Amino acid sequence: MPLKFGLIVATAALIASAASLMAADHQVQMLNKGTDGAMVFEPGFLKIAPGDTVTFIPTDKSHNVETFKGLIPDGVPDFKSKPNEQYQVKFDIPGAYVLKCTPHVGMGMVALIQVGDNPANLEPIKIAKVPNMVRKRLDADLAQITPAQITQ
């Protein structure tokens, strides 16, 4: 009996370990200046799989990451890091997530994370009333979602 129980525990541990190995951790830097200009998340667009995590790294000071109200999938709770805090988020629910740096959103400091294929919540992002610099960056990020991935 103890051998059978031990095999069950070992099998469960192996399955859990394999599942965690499949999930990836992506890194996004929060920068004063990057390849896309001033006040940017780099990369500004990221496509990940459900279950992956993203670590937001305040490479330069005075940055944070926060969900953009109404521009994340339904049922996902909002989150907000403190300034200068490295912050990790696990993305389980498929969809498009618009994130911002609270102090620098007026300068266009936003990021778009696509979780899985066929994000169903693109329309609210496309029509959202946001500052001009935010719209410019969001439109560039939205263009990286290929038409085959867009739900009509």
UniProtKB/Swiss-Prot annotation:
UniProt xrefs under Pfam families: Copper-bind
Keywords: Copper, Electron transport, Metal-binding, Periplasm, Signal, Transport
Residues binding Cu cation, per UniProt: 63, 101, 104, 109
Cofactor (UniProt): Cu cation
Cofactor binding note: Binds 1 copper ion per subunit.
Alphabetized Gene3D superfamilies for the sequence: Cupredoxins - blue copper proteins
Coiled-coil portions: none
GO cellular component terms listed in the entry, alphabetical order: periplasmic space
All copies of domain Plastocyanin-like, residue ranges: 28-116
Major location category of this protein: periplasm
Alphabetized GO MF terms: copper ion binding; electron transfer activity
Signal sequence residues: 1-23
InterPro entries: Amicyanin/Pseudoazurin, BlueCu_1, Copper_blue_Plastocyanin, Cupredoxin, Pseudoazurin
Cellular localisation: Periplasm
Function according to Swiss-Prot or TrEMBL: This soluble electron transfer copper protein is required for the inactivation of copper-containing nitrite reductase in the presence of oxygen.
Note: In R.leguminosarum (biovar viciae) pseudoazurin is dispensable for nitrogen fixation.
Protein name from the UniProt record: Putative pseudoazurin
Native organism: Rhizobium leguminosarum bv. viciae
Lineage: Bacteria, Pseudomonadati, Pseudomonadota, Alphaproteobacteria, Hyphomicrobiales
Gene of this entry: azu
